[in-house]
């Protein structure tokens, strides 16, 4: 089957930048209001996702803040080198990505794997981070779940049926996941080296240094957001992340693993309230 490489248009300019020798695609939202507001927010997607996964919350957030949203190396439409993906590799990539774009201070919103990356980055760069927002971050979970297993199956065998099944199980209310999200994932996982990058990243998270005892290094205000019915990374795994000093956990009712897709209005309201404090 042919791969549809059409990039969804969500009214944000697509940009390319070279980082560590790799071409990295990113979206950039900015306007006159956000130019006066010096706060930059960088959004980091989960494993197997892309910058476009955030499209449901960007129009509202971009009214107040400049947004930078990369396709993390190995994902989306960025380069997918056949290297060993480790958390150190991703942290170095993110540090150099920010340097290349001239971002010296930022707030970060990270989902799942992107939340884990944001956490690792912040532990070593707290002086650069104003606020940290983590939506069901990975890193604490060491045992797979049935929902994660289905997602892995969809990544390795990206048929429409497998992909739809995985996303319906990931969300609490299956109909909250748009068809575009399902087809975009399916198409991207058929791109060269996409499966390799996915599995190498999965192993990187599994083999990473544990978080316990290290989270106290984070000294920036932190918001944890979890879906009440998250079957991918269940709510129980939030306990380890609450070791972050000055952290707050907010539960979104009737929601699964992707609150910014399932409950974008509630997610945005929660985020904006936290950022404005």
Predicted regions and their residues:
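Conserved HGGG/HGGXW glycine-rich cap/lid loop of the alpha/beta-hydrolase fold
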Residues: 22-77
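Acidic catalytic loop of the alpha/beta-hydrolase fold
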Residues: 228-233
């Amino acid at each position: 089957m042919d791969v549809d490489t059409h990039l969804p248009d969500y009214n944000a300019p697509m940009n390319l930048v070279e980082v560590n020798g790799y071409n990295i695609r990113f979206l950039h939202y900015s306007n006159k209001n956000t130019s006066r507001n010096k706060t930059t927010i960088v959004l980091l997607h989960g494993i197997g996702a892309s910058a476009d996964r955030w499209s449901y919350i960007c129009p509202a957030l971009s009214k107040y803040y400049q947004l930078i949203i990369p396709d993390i190396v190995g994902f989306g439409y960025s380069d997918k080198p056949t290297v060993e993906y480790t958390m150190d590799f991703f942290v170095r990539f993110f540090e150099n990505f920010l340097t290349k774009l001239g971002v010296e201070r930022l707030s970060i919103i990270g989902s799942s794997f992107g939340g884990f990356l944001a956490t690792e980055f912040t532990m070593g760069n707290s002086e650069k981070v104003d606020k940290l927002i983590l939506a069901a971050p990975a890193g604490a979970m060491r045992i797979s779940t049935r929902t994660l297993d289905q997602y892995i199956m969809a990544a390795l065998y990206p048929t429409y049926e497998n992909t739809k099944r995985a996303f319906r199980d990931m969300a609490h209310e299956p109909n909250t996941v748009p068809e575009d999200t399902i087809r975009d994932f399916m198409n991207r996982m058929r791109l060269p080296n996409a499966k390799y990058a996915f599995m190498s990243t999965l192993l990187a998270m599994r083999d990473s240094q544990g978080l316990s005892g290290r989270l106290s290094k984070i000294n920036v205000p932190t918001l944890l957001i979890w879906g009440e019915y998250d079957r991918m990374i269940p709510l129980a795994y939030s306990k380890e992340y609450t070791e972050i000093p000055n952290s707050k956990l907010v539960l979104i009712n009737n929601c699964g693993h992707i609150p910014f897709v399932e409950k974008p209005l509630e997610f945005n309201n929660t985020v904006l309230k936290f950022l404005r404090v």
